[in-house]
């Protein structure tokens, strides 16, 4: 079985590179070697990111089914919606985006710059909604689908993070297949993999991919949702479904989902002092940009784990960089005095 049975529409450049983060590793004491899997530069479509990889397995259904409009949802600074909008433009499809008010952040430019600006540039129909943050299928999303159907359109639903779609986890099983090949080229295996998680399908796909070789407990998910119980339950559900799809013989349980909840505070989309410090440190040592919503918090978690010797000395750690830097301009107030 495996991934070969599923159609895949090419939207990425191919296997994403793994780069050594030597200066960051040295700055943190040199006891652990840090590497990055660069999903942040995986495509030429509106800066790419992890959702592009997932969409490669969803888009064949949209094309084969004759759908004319991609419909997706996220927060105002959603990476997901920006990537869906770019894919729609690339394919010549219409696109409707529901941008809910998930983040309690007051800035007059928040809904004008960053991801949402890029979505408008690629001609998506961007609709602001006052609903607050949660995971799962949202009423505003259902309403948009019903409205478009009544108007004679054929909308293709792409839920937040692609995570509620049955194929949402497949893309990151493919990411792990790339990692296995890259480990052979590098001549070593990674001891730990660190990845951000909110809606869960990136993390879930990596768990399933690593479970193919019994290494799923080496994956650390850094929660950025601030709703860790819901996130963990969703990750497990997606992982179990994805495992069945690819024919994984092992049954995954809650013990296979390792989520670190210490870095999501104070809320989804709001960085803490450690998040900003992590963004600056990663940028200053490596020239690699992370964002205040997702990757800044997972980078914060990685830095904390290394600094506090929570990862064994001599380990090689792979940080999965999921993208998200376009959101930085929406949070410029955090960096104005740097």
Curated annotation (Swiss-Prot):
EC identifiers of the protein: 3.5.99.7
Catalytic activity reported: 1-aminocyclopropane-1-carboxylate + H2O = 2-oxobutanoate + NH4(+)
Residues the record lists as N6-(pyridoxal phosphate)lysine modifications: 51
Pfam family, one: PALP
CDD domains: ACCD
Active site location: 78
Entry's Gene Ontology cellular component terms: cytosol; nucleus
Transmembrane segments: none
One Gene Ontology term of the molecular function aspect: 1-aminocyclopropane-1-carboxylate deaminase activity
Signal peptide, first to last residue: none
Cofactor(s) the record lists: pyridoxal 5'-phosphate
NCBIfam families, A to Z: ACC_deam
Record protein name field: Probable 1-aminocyclopropane-1-carboxylate deaminase
Organism, as annotated: Schizosaccharomyces pombe (strain 972 / ATCC 24843)
């Amino acid at each position: 079985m495996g991934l070969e049975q599923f159609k895949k529409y090419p939207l990425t450049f191919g296997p994403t590179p793994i780069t050594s983060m030597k200066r960051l590793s040295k700055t943190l004491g040199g006891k652990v070697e840090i590497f990055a899997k660069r999903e942040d530069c995986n495509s030429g479509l509106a800066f790419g990111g992890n959702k592009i990889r997932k969409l490669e397995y969803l888009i064949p259904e949209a094309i084969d089914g004759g759908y004319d409009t991609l419909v997706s949802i996220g927060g105002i600074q959603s990476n997901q919606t920006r990537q869906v909008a770019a894919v729609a433009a690339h394919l010549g499809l219409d696109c409707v985006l529901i941008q809910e008010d998930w983040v309690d952040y007051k800035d007059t430019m928040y809904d004008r710059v960053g991801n949402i600006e890029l979505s408008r540039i690629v001609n998506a129909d961007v609709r602001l909604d006052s609903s607050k943050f949660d995971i799962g299928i949202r009423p505003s999303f259902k309403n948009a689908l019903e409205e478009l159907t009544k108007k004679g359109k054929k909308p293709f639903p792409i839920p937040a993070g692609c995570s509620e779609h049955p194929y949402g986890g497949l893309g990151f099983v493919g990411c792990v297949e790339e990692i296995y090949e890259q480990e052979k080229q590098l001549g070593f295996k990674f001891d730990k993999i660190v990845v951000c998680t909110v809606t869960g399908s990136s993390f879930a796909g990596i768990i399933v991919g690593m479970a193919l070789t019994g290494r799923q407990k080496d994956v650390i998910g850094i929660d950025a949702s601030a709703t860790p119980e819901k996130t963990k339950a969703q990750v497990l559900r997606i992982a179990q479904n994805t495992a069945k799809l690819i024919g994984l013989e092992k049954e995954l349980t809650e013990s296979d989902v390792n989520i670190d909840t210490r870095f999501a505070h104070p809320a989804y989309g709001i960085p803490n002092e450690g998040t900003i410090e992590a963004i600056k440190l990663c940028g200053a040592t490596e020239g690699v940009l992370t964002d205040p919503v997702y990757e800044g918090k997972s980078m914060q978690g990685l830095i904390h784990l290394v600094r506090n010797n929570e990862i064994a000395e001599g380990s090689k750690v792979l940080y999965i960089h999921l993208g998200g830097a376009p959101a930085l301009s929406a949070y410029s107030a955090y960096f104005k005095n740097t």
